[in-house]
């Protein structure tokens, strides 16, 4: 019998997120100088920081490459930022091998075809509400939120609540 997503959430030690369509809504604002700007959700950032402070691994694997994104993620305390990844499966395997993380301990949130193969390797493949149909079909949990609109916060909060760690933030013990 297959485990429920909440049973799987109890095993999660590591969160891996794509950027475009997950941490952002997938839009790119092009400035007159050609610079591409993305908008990220503050609540998603709070949740990633809370996860790190609670001992979870947080990793970013993205095909995109934007220095502003890297700076934002570094400022949140994320050290494992893999932008311009030509093959997300290879990056995932290198990351999990380096830190000796079992794939079943990983929650991966992706939104589109480039995430498909890596999502098939993890314990808990998840996606935003507005992910592509192919990604929704393989996800064990589909957020009620769209990409860039709190989907990351939702899955982190869900895992931390299942593992009885979210209350530390809710009660102000991590100010």
Give residue spans per PLM region.
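Asp-based phosphoryl-transfer active-site loop
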Residues: 11-28, 119, 152
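Non-catalytic pre-domain segments flanking phosphatase-related domains
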Residues: 1-17, 165-175
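Substrate-recognition element of Asp-dependent hydrolases with the DxDx(T/V) motif
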Residues: 48-72, 83
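Short coil/turn segments at beta-strand junctions that form active-site/ligand-binding loops
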Residues: 11-13, 56, 104-105
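Short secondary-structure boundary segments
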Residues: 19, 63-64, 85, 129-131
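A positional/architectural concept
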Residues: 23-54, 63
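Mg2+-dependent phosphoryl-transfer enzymes with acidic/Ser/Thr/Gly-rich catalytic loops
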Residues: 34-38, 75-76, 80-82, 89-175
